[in-house]
Swiss-Prot record:
<dbReference type="GO" id="GO:0005739">
    <property type="term" value="C:mitochondrion"/>
</dbReference>
<protein>
    <recommendedName>
        <fullName>Lipid transferase CIDEA</fullName>
    </recommendedName>
</protein>
<dbReference type="GO" id="GO:0005811">
    <property type="term" value="C:lipid droplet"/>
</dbReference>
<dbReference type="GO" id="GO:0120013">
    <property type="term" value="F:lipid transfer activity"/>
</dbReference>
<dbReference type="Pfam" id="PF02017">
    <property type="entry name" value="CIDE-N"/>
</dbReference>
<dbReference type="GO" id="GO:0160077">
    <property type="term" value="P:lipid droplet fusion"/>
</dbReference>
<keyword id="KW-0804">Transcription</keyword>
<dbReference type="GO" id="GO:0019915">
    <property type="term" value="P:lipid storage"/>
</dbReference>
<comment type="function">
    <text>Lipid transferase that promotes unilocular lipid droplet formation by mediating lipid droplet fusion. Lipid droplet fusion promotes their enlargement, restricting lipolysis and favoring lipid storage. Localizes on the lipid droplet surface, at focal contact sites between lipid droplets, and mediates atypical lipid droplet fusion by promoting directional net neutral lipid transfer from the smaller to larger lipid droplets. The transfer direction may be driven by the internal pressure difference between the contacting lipid droplet pair and occurs at a lower rate than that promoted by CIDEC.</text>
</comment>
<feature type="domain" description="CIDE-N">
    <location>
        <begin position="33"/>
        <end position="110"/>
    </location>
</feature>
<keyword id="KW-0805">Transcription regulation</keyword>
<dbReference type="GO" id="GO:0006629">
    <property type="term" value="P:lipid metabolic process"/>
</dbReference>
<dbReference type="GO" id="GO:0005634">
    <property type="term" value="C:nucleus"/>
</dbReference>
<dbReference type="GO" id="GO:0045444">
    <property type="term" value="P:fat cell differentiation"/>
</dbReference>
<dbReference type="GO" id="GO:0120163">
    <property type="term" value="P:negative regulation of cold-induced thermogenesis"/>
</dbReference>
<dbReference type="GO" id="GO:0042803">
    <property type="term" value="F:protein homodimerization activity"/>
</dbReference>
<dbReference type="GO" id="GO:0032720">
    <property type="term" value="P:negative regulation of tumor necrosis factor production"/>
</dbReference>
């Protein structure tokens, strides 16, 4: 009986430990990595770059970098004034989203480049590329460069290049040179193969035979 009891206890202990670990994992809140964003005041006279992983952290850092002492503020999207007041909505936004902080009594207004939809001119361009250089820290070497490409006014792709230190700049430069060398090598291989194929086809074509029809007439 004691042996069976000891065996049952030894079997239950690992199961209990696994249950506690599973409960601990499920109850542990999901920690999101810090992402880059842009923030500005109500009249867009001051803009800053901020790294934040949550809505509360973004608001706190925005108040610090823009030197806002008012406790009651509202965070909205700069492009259309949509209020961002929930963590779920904040996590769905893309990196480098532009925000605007509004103090009590302030209202969102469209920027100088904003044109109502009914008055927007028709654009015939296929693609548009924009560059945005900003700094997350005054001590950064060059800052961060955001490259955004928009195709047919429908699809957009953005890439963030961080040049916060000289080593990072050198690393990105070497990476670009390596990629350019690979592309150049592939182009030369394809061009050489194509030229050899054209020359081979030219050599295989038979030379035209002289006509002897007039000799026997």
């Amino acid at each position: 009986m004691e042996t069976a009891r000891d065996y049952a206890g030894a079997l239950i202990r690992p199961l209990t430990f696994m249950g506690l670990q599973t409960k601990k994992v499920l109850l542990t809140p999901l920690i999101h990595p810090a992402r880059p964003f842009r923030v500005s005041n109500h009249d867009r006279s001051s803009r800053r770059g901020v790294m934040a992983s949550s809505l509360q952290e973004l608001i706190s850092k925005t108040l610090d970098v823009l030197v806002i002492t008012t406790g009651l503020v509202t965070l909205v999207l700069e492009e259309d004034g949509t209020v961002v007041d929930t963590e779920e909505f904040f996590q769905t936004l893309r990196d480098n989203t532009h925000f605007m902080i509004l103090e009590k009594g302030q209202k969102w207004t469209p920027g100088s480049k904003y044109v109502p939809v009914c008055k927007q001119p028709k654009k015939s361009g296929i693609a548009r590329v924009t560059f945005d250089l900003y700094r997350l820290n005054p001590k950064d070497f060059l800052g961060c460069l955001n490259v955004k490409a928009t195709m047919y006014e429908m699809y957009s792709v953005s890439y963030d290049i961080r040049c916060t230190s000289f080593k990072a700049v050198l690393r990105n430069l070497l990476r670009f040179m390596s990629y350019a060398a690979q592309m150049t090598g592939q182009f030369l291989v394809y061009a050489g193969t194509y030229m050899l194929r054209v020359l081979g086809d030219t050599e295989e074509q038979p030379s035209p035979k002289p006509s002897t029809k007039g000799w026997f007439m």
